[in-house]
């Protein structure tokens, strides 16, 4: 652990895609990892198996972060097995796209609750153990949609991600003196299930002329969760191949 306090890392929405890549990256750094999933048990178990085979420690944790009771349940389970959660990555997210007149209240509430409110509840639950340890890393997975720009058909998603960045900066200022950093990563076009079907329209606007990979996003999270990023807080790091340059 290189002098860090003993503890664990929790990654939400980690059964596949960006979340799975982040879980594996943190495990390579020596963190025991809680691999949270909502429905994809096989995917989460596959991530745990890969981490374990590589010499790391991990456990699969079922829970829907949209449920207000899930935060305590996830933390209690992980704390019992691996110790206090000192790295939290709020990655779980959903989309329910549609032009503003067509977004009903349920789709608005579901996206904002999962992408923003759940991240706040998990962060709130994480902060006290981190403050007691005088060490903590919170990384929120935002998006260039909302964090940097709007996108037609995604008013609910953009609002949730813009709010996530605002929350990141505010909480970062509150806990900076306690050895706790709070940052965000805003991916652009990344090869995942959530972005499938968007690539052809966007790729021609990406200066890098390619989509990013989950591993490239995970590497940014790995840095922000590291000892070397102790003076980096309140930042939103875009990972978009120059799309918003």
Predicted ranges, named:
Residues 128, 173-174, 230:
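Alpha-helical segment proximal to the catalytic Tyr-Lys
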Residues 15-16:
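Conserved glycine-rich cofactor-binding loop
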Residues 123, 160, 168:
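Active-site helix of classical SDR
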Residues 143:
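Residue(s) in the substrate-gating loop at a strand-loop-helix junction
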Residues 176, 181, 232-234:
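Short, small/polar-rich loop/turn modules that mediate ligand/substrate recognition or access, typified
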Residues 99-100, 104-112, 202:
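Substrate-binding pocket helix/loop in short-chain dehydrogenase/reductase
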Residues 120, 213-244:
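C-terminal substrate-recognition "lid" of short-chain dehydrogenase/reductases
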């Amino acid at each position: 652990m290189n002098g860090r306090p003993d503890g664990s890392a929790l990654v939400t929405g980690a059964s596949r895609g960006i979340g799975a890549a982040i879980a594996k990256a943190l495990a390579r750094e020596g963190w025991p990892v809680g691999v949270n999933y909502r429905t994809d048990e096989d995917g989460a178990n596959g991530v745990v198996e890969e981490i374990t085979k590589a010499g790391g420690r991990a456990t699969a944790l079922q829970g829907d972060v949209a449920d207000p009771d899930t935060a305590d349940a996830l933390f209690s389970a992980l704390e019992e097995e691996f110790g206090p959660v000192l790295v939290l990555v709020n990655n779980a997210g959903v989309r329910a796209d549609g032009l503003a007149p067509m977004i009903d209240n349920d789709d608005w509430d579901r996206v904002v609750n999962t992408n923003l409110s759940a991240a706040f509840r998990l962060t709130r639950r994480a902060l006290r153990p981190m403050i007691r340890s005088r060490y903590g890393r919170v990384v929120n997975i935002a998006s260039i949609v909302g964090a940097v720009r709007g996108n037609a058909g995604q008013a609910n998603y953009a609002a949730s991600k813009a709010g996530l960045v605002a929350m990141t900066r505010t909480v970062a200022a509150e806990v900076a003196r306690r050895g706790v950093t709070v940052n965000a990563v805003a991916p652009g076009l990344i090869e995942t299930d959530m972005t499938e079907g968007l690539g052809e329209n966007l790729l021609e606007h990406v200066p890098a002329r390619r989509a990013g990979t989950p591993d490239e996003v995970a590497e940014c999270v790995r840095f922000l969760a590291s000892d070397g990023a102790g003076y980096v807080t309140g930042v939103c790091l875009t990972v978009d191949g120059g799309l918003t340059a």
